[in-house]
Amino acid sequence: MQYMLDRRSASVYGLVLLTVVGLLGATQAISNLLLVPVVLAVVVYEFQKRLDQGVPLLQLTSLIAVLQWLVGPVLAYNNDYEYGKYQMYVDETTYFEYALPATTLYVAVMLAIGASIRQKELLSSLDKSNFVKIGLFLNVIGLIALFAAARFSGSVQFLFLLISQARYIGAIYFLFSRHQLRFVFAGASMSLLLLGAVNVGMFHDMLLWMALLFCYWFAQRKWTFKAKVLSLGLTGLFLFGLQVIKQDYRAQIRRGESPSLVAMMVGYLSPTGKAWDDGALANAIVRLNQGWIISAVMNHVPAEEPYADGGTLKEAVESALLPRFLAPDKKTAGGRENFIRFTGLMLEQGTSMGISPLGEAYANFGSFGGIFLMMGFGAFFGLLFKWSLRLLVKRPAFFFWLPLVFYQSIKAETEFVVVLNQLSKGLIVAIALYYFTELNFPVRTKKYILKTVAPVRRISPGRANA
């Protein structure tokens, strides 16, 4: 059964290239305009290579990190746009001599230690006859949990919100059910998420879950290289269009209007549309760039705020592993407190921003220690994902539940406390719901019986004549 797993999540050449670029970045001997595109090219190549093999979760995590920690910042440093509060707070050399090695080594270690799954082979033996029932069952549970979450706060609310995401796992079951209405059912499972995003103009969760569902669906068959490049190109164009309209779209919603998302995107992306104006391009770079927050941390720590020396990591582990009654003062998930503390910048009431693992690593140990912490984080994530994939060999249907465990880990802006909370509590919820579902609607593994044919007995000519 081990043929279903690839021991590494990237080619040896890709891993070596990432490491070399990271070391060159630490010296800043070569322009970042050359180094960052190389890193992006390697990660995009590894992502597309496994896109039709199985959900490339580690590669997707790497791609998002590279885009937000390296590509966004290099664009921000190399143009004349005005960014105001969202400016880079340290010079380019200072930022990239930390961010380039920390990011590339984080990605390289994670992909080297992690594994990739061969989805088609893994799921080929599953009996899919109960998949529609499971999808409906998970939607009912998810909706009940969603309404229950509105009545609670704190840890209990977080638990119900986790359970409410069972609807999206139900959508994956629908996609693999082979039912003639499977796409309609999957769309219905995602409908509240889509409507919520469109109504308030907050698209992050919607985009991430849609990307995960697309990866599951895409890997059901092999695609040509051209088809994969076309898919990535169209996705990139869609994301760019969404970023450039987002500000105006939200402004219209605040005025009580009902803007059309599709119409605005088409208008902005036309040859004479607003998407190509300096202001819109600057806004798109700001949306992509997580580096402005990281640079603010580097500017503020240790000049105004001393290094945390692992303090936030201890709080994250405590928050993830200890129940509230054992640690009543444990840290709650959310980035507002760390953002204000480590950047020195203020946030409006009700606004929360994370400083990202890269920013938090620097806030704890500075450049040198932060690089090693990011390597350790990559190793931890890669090992945990590999361990999860090995469990799938015996329980293939749990493959559909992986997003519930690793959802927050994919993001590039979430802090360690959020990541560890999702990993620990998401794993518990995923296992509990998986077994509860299996108890009611078991997914059996088909058993293939090889027919044996009796050997043909050869009769000598003498005996035949007799």
Please name every model-derived segment:
Residues 4-14, 53-66, 126-137, 179-187, ...:
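Membrane-interfacial loop-to-transmembrane alpha-helix junctions, especially the N-terminal start
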Residues 14-22, 39-43, 141-146, 166-173, ...:
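Hydrophobic, membrane-inserted alpha-helices
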Residues 58-67, 185-195, 209-212, 228-236, ...:
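Central hydrophobic cores of alpha-helical transmembrane segments
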Residues 79-250:
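Membrane-embedded catalytic interface detector for glycan/lipid assembly enzymes
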Residues 153-154, 350-466:
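Hydrophobic alpha-helical segments
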Residues 231-332:
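Aromatic-rich transmembrane-lumenal/periplasmic boundary elements in polytopic membrane proteins
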